[in-house]
């Protein structure tokens, strides 16, 4: 899958879209096919190394996403494949797929677009 990967801190234009492995699910997680990812001010600072939180390299930024659940992990009961959701990912959201704990999900109303949800 493709993801926006940060291998070093610096301006946005030094970072690249790369092929990475699809995330594996842990118990309590779902796999989301990302349709939209939010870009917040902290995200811009994080990739430049200007935020108090500095993740280890390489990392995939993206703390908020909207998309559809494509896979359900063990122990997840409140969601199903195909559900439209909003998730607070912490990181990893700027990818085609992201694994997140179901406890971070909210159902996205049909009246909202994925872009509005992210």
Cite the ranges covered by each PLM segment.
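A glycine-rich, Thr/Ser-enriched phosphate-binding loop motif common to dinucleotide/cofactor-binding enzymes
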Residues: 112-118
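Glycine-rich beta-strand-centered segment in the early N-terminal region that forms part
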Residues: 21-38, 50-92, 99
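Residue-level signal for short segments within beta-strands and strand-turn junctions
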Residues: 5-7, 48, 69
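Cytochrome P450 core scaffold surrounding the K-helix E-X-X-R motif
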Residues: 42-48
């Amino acid at each position: 899958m493709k993801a926006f990967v940060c291998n070093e801190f610096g301006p946005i234009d030094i970072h690249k879209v790369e092929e990475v492995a699809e995330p594996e699910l842990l118990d309590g997680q779902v796999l989301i096919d990302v349709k939209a990812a939010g870009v917040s001010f902290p995200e811009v600072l994080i990739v430049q190394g200007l935020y108090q939180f500095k993740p280890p390299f390489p990392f995939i930024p993206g703390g908020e996403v909207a998309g559809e659940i494509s896979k359900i992990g063990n122990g997840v009961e409140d969601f199903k494949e195909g559900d439209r959701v909003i998730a607070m990912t912490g990181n990893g959201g700027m990818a085609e797929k992201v694994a997140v704990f179901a406890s971070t999900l909210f159902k996205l109303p049909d009246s909202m677009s994925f872009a509005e949800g992210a």
